[in-house]
Amino acid sequence: MGAISLDGKTTRDEIFVDLKERVAALTAAGRTPGLGTVLVGDDPGSQAYVRGKHADCAKVGINSIRRDLPADITTEQLNETIDELNANPDCTGYIVQLPLPKHLDENAALERIDPAKDADGLHPTNLGRLVLGKQAALPCTPRGIVHLLRRFDVPIAGAHVVVIGRGVTVGRPMGLLLTRRSENATVTLCHTGTRDLPALTRQADIIIAAVGVPHMVTADMVKPGAAVVDVGVSRVDGKLTGDVAPDVWEVAGHVSPNPGGVGPLTRAFLLTNVVEAEESKLA
């Protein structure tokens, strides 16, 4: 018997129904949320991501604010765009689409975002608030993963979760979310320096793979019945490929498809962060 699919698309659609109602209420109060994007250059992947985000906005009634800039802009020109969105009352929250061209400092650009308008939940101030247990925008992908597990009744409280990958967008904040009292999981954070990774993953009730190494998590690394969340993105022969091998579906209890698992929820919680930011102004 194969694993249950952690279907992110259906779950995203449920979130969109809720968001559409909340946005309508905000609009009735004269406070329609606005999501901004800053896109530098013409990377096809980045363009596709930004198009998708604005298509999502249209579905739930959020206003779109786009700032598309040429690849050869200076740091000063990028800073001017960020400052303009920081001051723009129609922009509730926004993102700077990564990666930026190599002559631009990504960290400096992200730090320049007003933390109150940080739609991704990755500003150093907001990550610091997460560490302290204070209210702040949450990182979209980790938040989406927790929601997906809860949606399919995967037990989190008391579970041993092995996170593979220590990146800023998933690996590091994932542990912060899962060890909050509201989740109460025990987290082991693994990476390229981890010795005997399979020995750790075989103990896990939940595995979250976020390294971008195609099919690195195989069936022999998974405890029967465990939940496996695939966040990795690679291209193999031109096709998007995740970190989880196909044979894992025969051993695990739950597996997120990739694509179609976590990705839709990352986008859904980007919009959720913006809606919550606008709602907080009315509170």
UniProtKB/Swiss-Prot annotation:
GO biological process: L-histidine biosynthetic process; methionine biosynthetic process; purine nucleotide biosynthetic process; tetrahydrofolate interconversion
A cellular component annotation (GO) from this entry: cytosol
Alphabetized InterPro entries for the sequence: Aminoacid_DH-like_N_sf (IPR046346), NAD(P)-bd_dom_sf (IPR036291), THF_DH/CycHdrlase (IPR000672), THF_DH/CycHdrlase_cat_dom (IPR020630), THF_DH/CycHdrlase_NAD-bd_dom (IPR020631)
Signal peptide: none
Top-level taxonomic group: Bacteria
Record-listed E.C. numbers: 1.5.1.5, 3.5.4.9
GO molecular function, one term: methenyltetrahydrofolate cyclohydrolase activity
Catalytic activity: (6R)-5,10-methylene-5,6,7,8-tetrahydrofolate + NADP(+) = (6R)-5,10-methenyltetrahydrofolate + NADPH; (6R)-5,10-methenyltetrahydrofolate + H2O = (6R)-10-formyltetrahydrofolate + H(+)
Subunit structure as annotated in this protein's UniProt entry: Homodimer.
HAMAP family in UniProt: THF_DHG_CYH
Protein's UniProt name: Bifunctional protein FolD
